[in-house]
Amino acid sequence: MAARNGKNSILEKWRIDEKPVKIDKWDGAAVKNSLDDAAKKVLIEKYGYLESFNLVDGRLFICTVSCLFTIVALIWDYLHPFPESKPVLACCVVSYFIMMGILTLYTSYKEKNIFLVAMQKDPAGMDPDHSWCLSSSLKRFDDQYTLRMSFTDGKTKQSRETEFTKSVSVFFDENGTLVMDQYEKYVSKLHDTLATEKKTK
């Protein structure tokens, strides 16, 4: 009973600390970003998962290497004025565009629409961490928002996912304020569905 009361008090505090999010209902990017941020908040603050930045770090690494090529080109051209610097400049330009191509492939096939990777630590510290991913989509001039949640078992490496698609009007009132309690129910349902499947297998 005490454990249950403790859990309820944590959830209650999480709801009390929640501040209303108000956006322009006609701004699709703002709508999507606010829903994404709210879903992220549920996994991190309600369930206590730790955000992993490996996916973002990969993109930053590619961008950093691309910038290094441009810096090398500038320095080399300063030290060895054109046309002496022509071979190095050509090499840097080609390398830069190759890195941009790699970045495009990375964002398209690796990142996709993922905006959160969260790790669920094993309480005993014996098994590998479980991974939870959130991705979403909201087409331009469309009100149908899709939230996908995937779970990867750290031990078996098996993955499962589930999703919902709802009109954004379900989660915002007439003033453009996010109804967090309503949205939380949908996000928590996705999580609990995957968590239940995890326990039964």
From Swiss-Prot:
The keyword Endoplasmic reticulum applies. It is a multi-pass membrane protein. Keywords: Endoplasmic reticulum, Membrane, Transmembrane, Transmembrane helix. Residues 81-86 are lumenal. InterPro entries: Spc2/SPCS2 (IPR009582). It comes from the Eukaryota. GO terms for cellular component: signal peptidase complex. Pfam families: SPC25 (PF06703). Residues 1-59, 108-201 are cytoplasmic. GO terms for biological process: protein targeting to ER; signal peptide processing. The keyword Transit peptide does not apply. Component of the signal peptidase complex (SPC) composed of a catalytic subunit sec11a and three accessory subunits spcs1, spcs2 and spcs3. The complex induces a local thinning of the ER membrane which is used to measure the length of the signal peptide (SP) h-region of protein substrates. This ensures the selectivity of the complex towards h-regions shorter than 18-20 amino acids. Component of the signal peptidase complex (SPC) which catalyzes the cleavage of N-terminal signal sequences from nascent proteins as they are translocated into the lumen of the endoplasmic reticulum. Enhances the enzymatic activity of SPC and facilitates the interactions between different components of the translocation site. Belongs to the SPCS2 family. This is Signal peptidase complex subunit 2. It comes from Danio rerio. The gene is spcs2.
